[in-house]
Amino acid sequence: MHRIDETFRRLRAQSRKALIPFITAGDPSLEAAVPVMHALVRAGADVIELGVPFSDPMADGPVIQHSSERALQRGVGLAYVLQTVDVFRQSDAVTPVVLMGYLNPLEIYGIARFTQHAVACGVDGVLLVDLPPEEADEIRPIFSAAGLALIVLASPTTSASRLARLSGVAQGYLYYVSFSGVTGADRLDAQSAGDRLRGLRAQTQVPVVVGFGIRDAASAAVMAVDADGVVVGSALVTALSDAPDVDTACRRADAFLAPLRQALDAVK
């Protein structure tokens, strides 16, 4: 968790916005995972969200669903994801890594066992898109005691009372979903999202980042105005999806992310 906090403190001191790319572990290939993570950092990523493949990704659109399916067909499970972070940490002890996925794989693995292994491998936070509030209250103390942030989600349909509660318990950063729906949809409403983001940032002590609908440098810059950072997922996953080899995947990661970094650095 400390890596997340330190990263956002540094960015705030520099008046810069966080760039947070999402990739699915094991896609476009098993061999590409760690090299692509390093390529993203070189291109300007501040935090990496690493997707844990799941067979029923109900919050994800077709792009990430298919990416998850491809990874599962390659045998990717939670153990592989943790190993990926462990290998990444051998040459990057600074960049925060947040695992994003669903509750079921963690329950099968065992929450206590997962927490121990995740921290040992260098995971900084976990975002579970289908985590019920009552189970979050059970998991949060376990994660917190180990220094693992439980990242929470808010959306346009989240009630005011729920937002107030989320703002009080949020760790690492709060992830605001710019619209209700699945990942990869293309219906960004910057004005509405901006209003909500300003309210959230006034309510919570942690940084607020925004995701869903961010596809390129222009949309990233627009959404970053009222947020502490932006998350880009489906568009990046698409760019990587058919890379024939590791070198190509790394070049595509750099080519995709570098313009977003440049655009965000122009936002003050």
Curated annotation (Swiss-Prot):
Assigned protein family: Belongs to the TrpA family.
What do we know about how this protein assembles, alone or with others?
Tetramer of two alpha and two beta chains.
Protein name per UniProt: Tryptophan synthase alpha chain
Q: What is its EC number?
A: 4.2.1.20
**Role summary:** The alpha subunit is responsible for the aldol cleavage of indoleglycerol phosphate to indole and glyceraldehyde 3-phosphate.
So where's the catalytic machinery, residue-wise? E49 (proton acceptor), D60 (proton acceptor)
Q: Which residues form a coiled coil?
A: none
Membrane-traversing stretches = none
InterPro entries reported for this sequence: Aldolase_TIM, RibuloseP-bd_barrel, Trp_synthase_alpha_AS, Trp_synthase_suA
Q: Which gene encodes it?
A: trpA
Question: Part of which pathway?
Answer: Amino-acid biosynthesis; L-tryptophan biosynthesis; L-tryptophan from chorismate: step 5/5
Which UniProt keywords are present, listed alphabetically?
Amino-acid biosynthesis, Aromatic amino acid biosynthesis, Lyase, Tryptophan biosynthesis
A Pfam family annotated for this UniProt entry: Trp_syntA
